[in-house]
UniProtKB/Swiss-Prot annotation:
InterPro entries: 4FE4S_WBL, Whib
Native source species: Bifidobacterium longum (strain NCC 2705)
Post-translational modification: The Fe-S cluster can be nitrosylated by nitric oxide (NO). Upon Fe-S cluster removal intramolecular disulfide bonds are formed.
Keywords for the protein's UniProt record, in alphabetical order: 4Fe-4S, Cytoplasm, Disulfide bond, DNA-binding, Iron, Iron-sulfur, Metal-binding, Transcription, Transcription regulation
Recorded superkingdom: Bacteria
GO MF entry, a single one: metal ion binding
Recorded coiled-coil stretches: none
Cofactors required: [4Fe-4S] cluster
Disulfide partners: none
Broad class of the protein's primary localization: cytoplasm
Protein name: Transcriptional regulator WhiB1
GO CC, any one term: cytoplasm
Length: 92
């Protein structure tokens, strides 16, 4: 049976300290930590699956799929606006 998390066995982060991907805050030292986590993500073969999982399961914290918490929130907002715009155009 396949799981939504099967991709994790191939993830570049699998042997890294998980705390690297969950900084506290988003400025100063936390910003540097976010950038270090993203650098690991950039080398990952399953970055897209990771991001999809984070979005599908509403992961609000940490770096997933190469995106920070703020970046994923912005991505969700853009997607929501695009869906609304498309729905409004279909009503016209």
């Amino acid at each position: 049976m396949s799981s939504a998390f099967d991709w994790r066995a191939k993830a570049a982060c699998r042997d890294k300290d998980p705390e690297l991907f969950f900084p506290v805050g988003n400025t100063g030292a936390a910003y540097q930590q976010i950038e270090e986590a993203k650098a690991v993500c950039r080398t990952c073969k399953v970055i897209d699956a990771c991001l999809k999982c984070a979005l599908d399961t509403n992961q609000d914290y940490g770096v997933w799929g190469g995106l920070s918490e703020d970046e994923r929130r912005a991505l969700k907002r853009r997607a929501m606006r695009a869906r609304r715009s498309q729905a409004m155009q279909m009503q016209i």
